């Protein structure tokens, strides 16, 4: 996959070994709730959050991501969002080569203060592990965000530059046009560490990266 510079990025082991310096002790994570722990929230704090809230609220921390050091609670999905996410997940895995795999709603630990949870990502198959709670950017070839009303600013403005800076070579943003998906396809320019728009796809998605893809957007599986 595309990387920036000549130095090799950190390995999975390097990223995992950084966990202790990127997290607080489990008992301290919610000690100051609703304020963050001393030093602010870190990417590995998300692994230490309980499922239920500090006052027993069920599934309070079930859908949360870390964006620039702030906890972001994600709203329930609308049917359009769930349908497109599932359909693309199926189609991408049908067409992917053996060395690549599509995953849905898995965290990406980009650095100490960033752990977003994109709707879909294409990763190296050899990096997949049922015990992981996140993937590092070095194994990610494509990130897909499906825009919802509450996530418009994050998906359009906040997240893409960070994905690009971390060297993720491909980014798709999916918009809802009268309950039909419109896919904006971006490719990384390694010279500037920024994305450039390479196409807007209505009805049919046909691209060559991160692998040859041809999907009828009107015929996504439910």
Regions found by a protein language model. Name each.
Residues 2-222:
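Gly/Pro/Ser/Thr-rich low-complexity, intrinsically disordered segments predominantly at protein N-termini
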């Amino acid at each position: 996959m595309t990387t920036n510079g000549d130095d090799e990025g950190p390995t999975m082991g390097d990223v995992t070994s950084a966990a202790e310096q990127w997290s607080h002790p489990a008992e301290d994570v919610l000690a100051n709730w609703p304020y963050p722990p001393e030093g602010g929230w870190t990417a590995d704090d998300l692994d230490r959050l309980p499922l239920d809230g500090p006052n027993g609220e069920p599934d309070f921390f079930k859908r949360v991501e870390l964006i620039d050091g702030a906890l972001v609670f994600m709203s329930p999905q609308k049917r359009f969002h769930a349908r497109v996410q599932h359909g693309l997940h199926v189609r991408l895995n049908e067409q992917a080569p053996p060395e690549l795999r599509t995953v849905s709603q898995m965290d990406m630990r980009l650095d100490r203060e960033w752990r977003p949870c994109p709707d879909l990502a294409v990763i190296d198959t050899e990096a997949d592990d049922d015990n992981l709670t996140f993937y590092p950017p070095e194994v990610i070839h494509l990130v897909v965000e499906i825009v919802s009303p509450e996530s418009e600013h994050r998906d359009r403005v906040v997240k893409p530059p960070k994905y690009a800076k971390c060297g993720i070579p491909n980014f798709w943003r999916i918009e809802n046009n009268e309950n039909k998906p419109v896919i904006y396809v971006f490719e990384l320019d390694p010279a500037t560490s920024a994305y450039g728009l390479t196409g807007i796809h209505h009805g049919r998605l046909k691209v060559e990266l991160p692998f040859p893809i041809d999907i009828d957007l009107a015929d996504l599986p439910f």
